[in-house]
UniProtKB/Swiss-Prot annotation:
GO cellular component, one term: plasma membrane
Annotated SUPFAM superfamilies: HydB/Nqo4-like (SSF56762), Nqo5-like (SSF143243)
UniProt catalytic activity: a quinone + NADH + 5 H(+)(in) = a quinol + NAD(+) + 4 H(+)(out)
Keyword Transferase: no
Name by which UniProt lists this protein: NADH-quinone oxidoreductase subunit C/D
Pfam family for this entry, one: Complex1_30kDa
Keywords assigned by UniProt, alphabetized: Cell inner membrane, Cell membrane, Membrane, Multifunctional enzyme, NAD, Quinone, Translocase, Transport, Ubiquinone
Function of the protein: NDH-1 shuttles electrons from NADH, via FMN and iron-sulfur (Fe-S) centers, to quinones in the respiratory chain. The immediate electron acceptor for the enzyme in this species is believed to be ubiquinone. Couples the redox reaction to proton translocation (for every two electrons transferred, four hydrogen ions are translocated across the cytoplasmic membrane), and thus conserves the redox energy in a proton gradient.
Species whose genome carries this gene: Blochmanniella floridana
Assembly description: NDH-1 is composed of 13 different subunits. Subunits NuoB, CD, E, F, and G constitute the peripheral sector of the complex.
GO molecular function: NAD binding; NADH dehydrogenase (ubiquinone) activity; NADH:ubiquinone reductase (non-electrogenic) activity; quinone binding
Entry's family note: In the N-terminal section; belongs to the complex I 30 kDa subunit family. In the C-terminal section; belongs to the complex I 49 kDa subunit family.
InterPro entries linked: NADH_DH_suC, NADH_DH_suCD, NADH_Q_OxRdtase_suD, NADH_quin_OxRdtase_su_C/D-like, NADH_UbQ_OxRdtase_30kDa_su, NADH_UbQ_OxRdtase_49kDa_CS, NDH1_su_D/H, NiFe-Hase_large
Length: 596
């Protein structure tokens, strides 16, 4: 059961860091490149904005290139106290690029002053920078020169201000004058929803015909949430389309700046509301890095067990609703019965079903109940035969194959260009799953396989991989069942929150600590951390900045569904509307994960 993947990855990180740094200073010199250290297993370099394109192009072309833009966002540095040895900056643009072949990442930071809030767009280097730059512009006011369409993407067009700037209110009650949605404002917002093709570089007609523009959503059942796609049609053929997101935006990152480190945990469950505890994992791991907390083995395995239960639960919903979208009705009724059995296990452990908020900074909320193993065993005995049934009625169904094989397809190069992760990427033949490639929370101690495709990610292969992943999760859960370690479920570190109550009842100092950490929150040492995990829909991560306070200075949530929806137009052009329905069902997304 044991292996050394984690330690191999750590050693390789050190080697790759020196290799990349040496190649960069050989090419560009070192006089204006500044290294930064943080609790992040990546090379972090501050660079002047004039160098962003040359350095990006260089890293994309070197041996074992960095071919995926994983994330791009901004930071308001103006109120940050602990900036020792960092370049002068009022704002920072943060670029995270990945290399699957190196299994190592580079983070580039560009400092900006308030009187020069602009940087050149990198859409010429990475296609998926488009949406990220639009989001960064509307949240911080950072202008990306030469961007093809620098408009609002998440907030309404009529919205004023830049919500992630520090002076912007974090609560509705802090607005002055108070925010009210008057009838006039509502009418203006509705007018903004009127689609004007010219704003998107589209033509209303050509020499031979007038095109039809069709709103699919935001209330259509096949768009899986409040999501609108405007289709440019020639008959039933999709000439082009524009995904319109933001209807589910709740300001999850802004909330991270107003909640204590501990009280933010319930919010993580609701970012991707089907993933449950998987959403808590990257957040608590990132905080634990900042705090220097080592989690007990029993807590690690409990976290993995709950995460894999939620993974199967999410995959069952994906499989059943996807099949329903293309006309196979039976599985959706059966899958909800299966999901209830999993929820029964989760509820017996955590007391909740969909959103347990069960992980804690330093461990988990409580130990396992006495009968946990019996309930889990019954569930694991039941699931394999039900999954086999779904294979029979779906994967072997000739009509389903006709609807999905070769539909919504793309290869490895396109997947990497658009920032695709999860089963969509692995279906192209790229074996990259963070549980194996960069193991966390004890995954290096488990024996399981990573299902990969045959080189083409299409609607059929993505479903095949999801089903195979459920079998692998069952393997992991069986190992949890047989090898659950004994010991505490929470660290005795002073910053563990909330501290162990048994100590608070014995000593006045620990009682005071318990009171302060529960009411105000723990004071986390200043630094930065990043934790990526293999979530249900792809790679999810939290990038946290602590300024030595009880709350996060910056909480960046990178979700997999955001880039997956940006890819839709490139995949579906030239297809028919029924193909789009199949493609949307095969992506596996929920809008809370997209909009945050």
């Amino acid at each position: 059961m044991m292996n050394d993947n984690k330690y191999i990855h750590i050693d390789s990180c050190v080697i790759e860091k020196h290799k990349i740094w040496d190649s960069l200073i050989t090419k560009f010199g070192s006089h204006d490149l500044i290294l930064q250290s943080a609790y992040i297993d990546s090379l972090i370099i501050w660079i002047p904005k004039e160098r962003i394109i040359p350095i990006m192009e260089f890293l994309k072309q070197i041996l074992a290139p960095h071919v995926m833009l994983y994330d791009l966002h901004g930071i308001d540095e103006r109120l940050r106290m602990y900036r020792k040895e960092l370049p002068e900056a009022d704002f920072t643009v943060f670029y995270h690029i990945m290399s699957m072949s190196r299994n190592y990442d580079v983070i580039l930071k560009v400092p900006l002053l308030e009187n020069a809030m602009n940087v050149t767009t990198i859409t010429s280097v990475f296609m998926n920078a488009n949406w990220y730059e639009r989001e960064t512009w509307e949240m911080f006011g950072i202008h990306f020169d030469y961007h093809p369409n620098l408009t609002r993407i998440i907030m309404p067009k009529c919205w004023k201000g830049f919500p992630l700037r520090k002076e912007y209110p974090a609560r509705a009650t802090e607005f002055y004058p108070a925010f009210t949605l008057t009838r006039k404002k509502e009418d203006l917002a509705m007018d903004d929803l009127l689609f004007k093709p010219e704003e998107w570089g589209m033509h209303r007609n050509n020499k031979h015909e007038d095109f039809m523009f069709l709103n699919l959503g935001p209330n259509h059942p096949s768009v899986h949430g409040v999501f609108r796609i405007i289709l440019q049609l020639s008959g039933e053929e999709i000439i082009d389309c524009v995904p319109d997101i933001g209807y589910h935006h709740r300001g999850a990152e802004k909330m991270g700046e107003r909640q204590s480190w501990h009280s933010y945990i319930p919010y993580t469950d609701r970012v991707e509301y089907l993933g449950g505890c998987i959403n808590e994992m990257p957040y608590v791991l990132a905080v634990e890095k900042l705090a220097g907390i080592v989690v007990p083995d029993r807590a690690k395995i409990i976290r993995i067990m709950l995460s894999e239960l939620f993974r199967i639960n999410s995959h069952l919903l994906y499989v059943s609703t996807y099949l329903q979208d293309v006309g196979v009705m039976t599985p959706v009724f059966l899958a909800f019965t299966d999901r209830q059995k999993i929820y029964d296990v989760i509820e017996s452990i955590t007391g909740a079903r969909m959103h347990p908020a069960w992980f804690r900074i330093g461990g988990v909320a409580d130990d396992l109940p006495l009968n946990w193993s019996d309930l889990l065993k019954q569930c694991l005995d039941w699931l394999p035969k039900r999954i086999a049934f779904y294979i029979d009625i779906a994967l072997k169904n000739s009509i389903f194959k006709k609807r999905t094989c070769g539909i919504g397809s793309y290869g490895a190069k396109e997947a990497l260009s658009w920032g695709v992760t999860g089963s969509g990427l692995r279906a192209t033949g790229i074996e990259f799953d963070l549980r194996k490639s960069r193991p966390y929370s004890g995954y290096e101690n488990f024996d399981f396989d990573i299902p990969i495709g045959n080189g083409l990610s299409d609607c059929y292969n993505r479903l095949v991989l999801k089903i195979e992943e459920m079998y692998q999760s069952i393997r992991i859960l069986n190992q949890c069942l047989k090898n659950m370690p004994t010991g505490p479920v929470k660290s005795d570190h002073p910053l563990t929150t909330p501290p162990m109550k048994k100590y608070a009842l014995k000593h006045i100092e620990t009682l005071i600590t318990h009171f302060l950490q529960v009411s105000w929150g723990p004071v986390i040492p200043p630094n930065e951390s990043l934790q990526m995990v293999e979530a249900t829909k792809g790679i999810n991560s939290y990038y946290l900045i602590s300024d030595g306070n009880t709350m996060s200075y910056r909480t960046r949530i990178r979700t997999p569904s955001f880039p997956h929806l940006q890819q839709i137009p490139s995949v579906i052009r030239g297809s028919l509307i029924p193909d789009l329905i199949a493609y949307l069902g095969s992506i596996d997304f929920v809008m809370s994960d997209v909009d945050r």
